[in-house]
Each structure stands twice: as C-alpha cells, then as structure tokens.
C-alpha cells in the first residue's frame, strides 16, 4: 500500500501547497538525547549539510581520516533535499584527531567535534527537531484549522516515502526477492528491503485502524505501549475500561506491528484484525521470517511536540516541531496539505 492510499486521520486535506521549494524549507536538527563523553577512541563530528546524502558524507569523512567506511557510523539517514544537522562517529583507536580545518565538501560545514567512548549506532537518538516552510498554500484558514487539530490529536505515525525509496523501489525489489526473482547479497540492500517490507505492513494495519476510527479505541488483545517507551503489554479484557481511559489521557498508546519471525504481540480480536490486513503481504512476511528479523511494535499515532507555526504571509507558513526517533515529518505534512506527488519525490533521499 503506497502512502497515497493510506487513510488520513482528519480526512484528506483540501488545501494544497508545496514543501521543499528549496532545501532551506526543510531543516532537521538531530537530537541524540545525550552529549559526547569528551574522551574515548571514537570521535564525534557534528555536521550541518545541505543537499548531501548521509552515506556520501560518511564516506567522505572516512577518506579524509584515512579509515575504512565501516569505521564511520551515524544514528540515522537524513533527508538529502534539506538542511540537516547530525552527528557522525569516527572510530580512531590510537590515532590523532584529523585537522578538520582542511576538510572541504560542498554543502557541508563542521560545527564541532568531541571524543566519545562508545560507537554511535543506528537508532541511537532521541528524536529530531524540524523547521519546515510550506509555500503556495491555497486555503489559509483550512491549514490553520488542521494545525490546531494536529496540536490536539497528533497524526498517523506512518513511515514516509523515504523508507520505500524512489518510486517505491525498495518495496518493489523486496517483493522480487520474496518471489525468488532476484538474489540480494549486499547487506545494506537487504536491510533496506526488509525495512521497507515491515514498514509497509505497519502502515497497512495502522491505516485500517484509522479507517474504522479505532486508532484510540482499545480492543481485546491490543498491544499497548507506555507513551515514549518501546516495550508493550497485551490489553486484558477485564481492564479494558481502565486502559481505554489511560489511552485517552495520553499515558498509553495503541500499537501496530513491525512483523518479524515471532508472534505479532497481539491476541484475540486484535490479532485477528492484524492478520486480516497483513494477508496481502504474506510472501514478504515469509521473507522476513526467513531472514530472522526480530519483530517489534510501533505506536499508531504520534504527537508532534512543541508544535508552533507562524504565517510569513497569507500563503506561506513556517512550522516547527519535534518528533521521536523513527517518526517522519512528511507524515505530519501529509495531514496539513495535499501535495502534488511530483513534489513528494523530492523528499526521498
């Protein structure tokens, strides 16, 4: 199921607009949730980059430092068509810190460096702060109304277009792999294809719950998550009224699956519901099981934190917010304006 087919929380937006008329209209600042140690065999490098692919920057840092590309890590991929600030981690055991004054890469600026004891691993961040500018908005008041709704009720926690690659190629190739039409040897491609498969399955289940307006209605066997935590527990039928109130109060969140080679995590009615909407992905799920990917859960909704906006003129609005790691700003924008799909392709790294 492509993003255009997923259900909206507040209905498809009537207002149109443009995101990313230029990279400066999409600013991302990584929030690791911790500060570097100040000592250790790893060197943390904080970079501001414009129009640069994350892996390309990592490879450039590796060449400059004279180390293998595998010795440079980062917490996550960032959008290419954007201005992004993120940390890279160079493993330099017993080596002097390179003189970054002579490091030159178009579109990149080194902000600071610091030593670190441990490697920076994928996913090791708290979240990201976003500052976006939406232009050529067709209906000022409709966008204003949407922003107020989102401030109160959040948005679907869908995986965005970036997860599926340009023109959905990651998911297309995953399906070919699942059908034994191709062999995938490259580790990074295997990871991208499996991730796209699981993301599509999550989106399908989350969209189905939203279509039935059950995104915040606890049903028997639901897997519930403490807000902001990764672990979950199964809703006991005897406690449904209490659990329902905790969901309404924002203490708990209803989740959908990122399937793996084990059980979904739900039971009874909720498990039956999820299996129904995962059935079209049976071959991809078999691939995921074969590759022994560990399953997990993800909240169906996400609440943008510190959401604020300022109208620069009647058809241009600047929006700022913070999202936890793994959530997509483009899924927030999707609830605000109806974008031309030709513009959406500029979002994919």
Curated annotation (Swiss-Prot):
Domain of life according to the entry: Bacteria
GO terms under biological process: tRNA pseudouridine synthesis
Positions of the TRUD domain: 154-302
Pfam families, alphabetized: TruD (PF01142)
EC primary class: isomerase
KW Glycoprotein (keyword) present: no
Catalytic activity: uridine(13) in tRNA = pseudouridine(13) in tRNA
Cellular component annotations (GO), alphabetically ordered: cytosol
Enzyme Commission code: 5.4.99.27
Molecular function (Gene Ontology), one example: RNA binding
Catalytic residue list: 79 (nucleophile)
UniProt keyword terms in alphabetical order: Isomerase, tRNA processing
Binding positions for substrate per the UniProt entry: 26, 128, 328
Function: Responsible for synthesis of pseudouridine from uracil-13 in transfer RNAs.
HAMAP family per UniProt: TruD
Family, similarity comment: Belongs to the pseudouridine synthase TruD family.
Protein's UniProt name: tRNA pseudouridine synthase D
Encoding gene per record: truD
